[in-house]
Regions:
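Acidic/histidine-enriched, beta-strand-rich ligand/metal-binding domains
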Residues: 1-70
């Protein structure tokens, strides 16, 4: 999945597949997670957030199932 870099102290890059509602998040520690069932509005909110890390923790981290892919 193609990801775009973001300016964040915790998150390195973010990608989204609208056909499968899958959000992919790469952290600065090198780990990559895919979150399932994420609506496009949540992805857009994450990308546009003033603080990507805060938005991620408040709206995504504990709301969607995930797997570590790297």
């Amino acid at each position: 999945m193609e990801r775009q870099p973001v300016t964040s102290s915790n998150i390195r890059s973010i990608g989204y597949d609208a056909s499968t509602f899958t959000l992919e998040v790469e952290f600065h520690n090198g780990r990559v997670y895919q979150y399932s069932g994420v609506p496009e509005s949540a992805y857009v909110g994450l990308v546009q957030a003033a603080s990507h890390g805060s938005y991620f923790h408040q709206h995504i981290r504990d709301r969607y199932s995930y797997v570590e892919v790297a």
